[in-house]
Amino acid sequence: MPRHETDCRYFANGYCSKGNTCTFTHDVATRNENICHFNLVGKCSYGRACRFLHTRPRNDELPSCSTPQTSQNQQNLQNSGQRVRPKQLPELKFNAQAAEFVPRWKMPQRGPVTSYAGAAASADHGESSSSFQSSHEQAQLMMCPYHQKSGDCNRQDMDCPFAHGNYCDMCQQWSLHPYNAELRKKHENECVANHTTEMERAFLLQKTEQKTCGICMENIFEKNLRFGILNGCQHCFCLDCIRQWRSKDQENVELATKTVRSCPECRQHSDYVIPSLFWVESGQEKDLLIEMYKENTKRKICKYYSNERSRGACPFGNKCFYKHQLPDGSIDPGEAPSSRRRPRLVDFLFDDNSDSDEETFRRFQEEHEEEQEELLRFVAETLPEADEESELFRQITEVLRHYQISGHRRGFQ
């Protein structure tokens, strides 16, 4: 293999990994006997496996220093014939006799230490006011954050530029300003307000833990459910059960809306259900909950206005709690909600808007005169015992009212 005229620097240093296949010149005359420098000081970790020579060089083959020396120094070293030994460095060990480390801020003060506030005060008011502040300046001092939490400050009282407050029994912190009565009174009022809020929350939680749903009979708090509070009564239900109960008028046509909109226990009508994490029974707490519920729903867009197909078809009209926002950002005022009415029996018997003549009505009255007399006799016997909430009472009342109106209109009353 052709070789370059350049000498192999790896072979010259003692070892070439390519051996005879190296393309550079391996000249023995240029090879330097690499002596292990670690062995010279007696600390070679490889031992016999080291690839460098573990021999001591002759006087004329001493290793050169890393820094270049002048020719005069080399000549003096060769002429002296002295053997140069490497300098032995001291071994690193833990000193058990060393002094204990003390942070600077814990060291005893050798002289007066002037804080930033003290330096500013001395610059403004002179040397006489550096150690004393007026009552107005003391009242404007900020509270020390370290002393406020634990009552302990790393600095001494005379060196800390902040005010060290007094202990507050309500919040159990050193938060009472020692010089400013206004700030001290303000903090006391805040603590009293927070304490009152925590007490009210504890009372609500105590009442909440004992409530069970009137439909599924489960403990609502233990099941991690929400309460469905009716605005018209004080009975307790979980939100899922009462919503399922109130949606039956859309699933089963046999149940009237008035029935499912009433409480399952007391039949008291309620217009809406309020979801809540705590049980609120009555009084100002319930009024506040209703106001918060309405304010919260005002920020949400009504589902009938979020869909393009049903936009503007909200059955609640301007009575809806949600926001009727149009795509352009404007608010639709809406109209009053229209009342929904189920089909009645009288609607199929008579039609007030029909254009039937008097002859048709007279013939119908003659044909059904006997049925009318029997119906009136039946009503006279049954009406005192009929329940005003029953469906029969409602239908009979509608028929009689229609007979009376039709007869008065045509002169047959």
From Swiss-Prot:
Assigned EC number: 2.3.2.27
GO cellular component term of the entry, any: cytoplasm
Gene3D superfamilies named in the record: Zinc finger, CCCH-type, Zinc/RING finger domain, C3HC4 (zinc finger)
Assembly mode: Component of a complex at least containing lep-2, lin-28 and the long non-coding RNA lep-5, which mediates the degradation of lin-28.
The protein, known as: E3 ubiquitin-protein ligase makorin
UniProt entry keywords in alphabetical sequence: Cytoplasm, Differentiation, Metal-binding, Repeat, RNA-binding, Sexual differentiation, Transferase, Ubl conjugation pathway, Zinc, Zinc-finger
Pathway as given in its UniProt record: Protein modification; protein ubiquitination
UniProt region (Disordered), positions on chain: 61-85
InterPro entries: MKRN-like, Znf_CCCH, Znf_CCCH_sf, Znf_RING, Znf_RING/FYVE/PHD, Znf_RING_CS
Primary subcellular site in the record, as a coarse category: cytoplasm
Main EC class the enzyme belongs to: transferase
Zinc finger (RING-type): 213-267
GO biological process, one term: nematode larval development
SUPFAM superfamilies in the record: CCCH zinc finger, RING/U-box
Reported effect, C22Y: In sy68; impaired male mating behavior. Some hermaphrodites and males fail to exit the molting cycle and undergo an additional molt. Such males do not fully shed the molted cuticle and die by rupturing through the cloaca
Location in the cell: Cytoplasm
Organism field: Caenorhabditis elegans
Record field: catalytic activity: S-ubiquitinyl-[E2 ubiquitin-conjugating enzyme]-L-cysteine + [acceptor protein]-L-lysine = [E2 ubiquitin-conjugating enzyme]-L-cysteine + N(6)-ubiquitinyl-[acceptor protein]-L-lysine
Tissue note: Expressed in seam, tail tip, and other hypodermal cells, head and tail neurons, the pharynx, intestine and the developing hermaphrodite somatic gonad. Not expressed in body wall muscle cells.
Signal peptide coordinates: none
Stretches annotated zinc finger (C3H1-type): 2-29, 30-57, 138-167, 296-327
Role played: E3 ubiquitin ligase which catalyzes the covalent attachment of ubiquitin moieties onto substrate proteins. Promotes the larval to adult transition by binding to the long non-coding RNA lep-5 to target the heterochronic protein lin-28 for degradation by the proteasome. This association and degradation of lin-28 also controls the timing of the sexual differentiation of individual neurons in males including the AIM, AWA, ADF, ASJ and CEM neurons. Plays a role in governing the developmental timing of male tail tip morphogenesis.
